[in-house]
């Protein structure tokens, strides 16, 4: 039998826009989950959340008027306590039964069964299912209690005496089961079928809902409200795209801004506005941030991604003549843009170098000193990185004009100036622009080629998917800056814990990993840490072991997120490769090897060899004495290994990891024969030691790219 659908709406004053989406999802999800748990809604019930600035609502399909009765087995007490020697009920049992609404007449029907400790008595009773009014009241109370509200407000109800606490004052409650009102109450409100539409543009003062299923349609036609968050968001996107296309432009793509604007309007209406073109002399990042952060506007870009003097607003009203709305928004944004222009002009009156002494007055961390001291540490770490690139066994090619001495000089200059924009008016107003403004001011001063870009890029990557630094100077500076942060904070014990990572150390670690891997730099992570620690002198404890493990864990998570299996990642990282730029090639090689028909047997054999070597007494040397190869199978394995290993090693040295691993496939047959025909732990100590040496040599040859035993099932 099908059941009617349910609609519940709480009508409130304007909700916090940044929290609205989560509030709507939480309200709908918790209420529906409670109904399902109470047997009033099926597991397959469709739950539709609604959330607008002035309402939280949910529509649930197939809700029963009453939950089914159910049988409940109540454990009473051990038989020895419940019955006396004659088998009669004890006072303790009668008291327990009375508490459950039963009497002595049910004693003969009580069930006996063990409870894990002793035999006990159980009462099998029928519990009536909750009515919808009962179940919905509980669900509504749960949903409101579990809303993710950071701060509540207290307000008085209409009686003038009662006070309640909620995120915003509530003024209406709707609960419809089909076309019937469900008698529930909350926050001093009793459920009905009346709600309100748009504050200014509703066709009727109150919307009388006919049915649970007519909620969205009636609110839109009678109340001028698009109640669904996603439906309203989609309508805003449609209007933004259409308005931008009509201008031959495109709106900026910003999901967070779109969500916030969706939470601010109930009837979106997109309008085109503009500002004076002379403001475009200010860096577009400043203007865009001003319009987005302060005014919630959508700047318009041309086909090349350059900011234009036009922007879009999302109004909550649709007047016949929108000129007043457009003019008002253009008038409001003008002082904001003028402020940005003033900051930009004032900042350029001082050079970045003249601001360097001011860094000594900006505290970075109580235990790590000032930004001035930090800049000197970044310079020292940058110098160490350049030296490591110079000495790398794999040549690192810099630009023709960037000999290593020149590169080091640029890194030193960029590191000294990188944080000076923290002292500018623009960054003081918009901290999000740090680095970006430093780059603009450096270009304005005509600093050396590449230094301005390095200053601008040294925070990159700022987030997942962000671009990496664009030049060599920026790459070294970004590494040095992130390593300074990681080493310093780990060195004073400020490690991330659980969900808490106030210094974004996970992001910094991932930034180092991405730069090393994606730019395939010939740098070893342990060497980088070794080069960074001395910059701190006596300020910190040695963090290298903990930090290396931390970065290894972040690398493993990142690789799994890219689609590599846990086995593949474990196999490569088990060798703790120092050069992270090698890791993608090693993973590709492992994946190719695993697809070979010989892979499973070789991985299993590798695991077996590892276990044998672990159990061997003393140190096993990877050495083979041909004169002690007594059995044909061990002779054949030694010969096959002698033939395969040089080629595999040469391929490994050339970075041809896939080919190196694939060369090992030829060892499957002799390895299988060895384990079938040869007793490793021979009684003769010399034979035993030689066979262990053969296995150690084989183990070393097989595990240069990855620890193949990790691939064994």
Curated annotation (Swiss-Prot):
UniProt key word Cytoplasm: yes
Q: Name one GO cellular component term.
A: cytosol
Q: What is its EC number?
A: 6.1.1.14
Top-level taxon in the UniProt lineage: Bacteria
- Give a yes or no for keyword Translocase in this entry: no
Q: What is its main location?
A: cytoplasm
Which HAMAP family does the protein's record reference?
Gly_tRNA_synth_beta
The GO terms describing molecular function are: arginine-tRNA ligase activity; ATP binding; glycine-tRNA ligase activity
An example GO BP is: arginyl-tRNA aminoacylation
The protein here is known as: Glycine--tRNA ligase beta subunit
Note the Gene3D superfamilies from the entry. Isoleucyl-tRNA Synthetase, Domain 1
What is its subcellular localisation? Cytoplasm
Organism from which the protein derives? Leptothrix cholodnii (strain ATCC 51168 / LMG 8142 / SP-6) (Leptothrix discophora (strain SP-6))
Q: Keyword set for this entry?
A: Aminoacyl-tRNA synthetase, ATP-binding, Cytoplasm, Ligase, Nucleotide-binding, Protein biosynthesis
Q: Which reaction does it catalyse?
A: tRNA(Gly) + glycine + ATP = glycyl-tRNA(Gly) + AMP + diphosphate
Indicate the quaternary assembly: Tetramer of two alpha and two beta subunits.
Question: According to its UniProt record, which protein family does this protein belong to?
Answer: Belongs to the class-II aminoacyl-tRNA synthetase family.
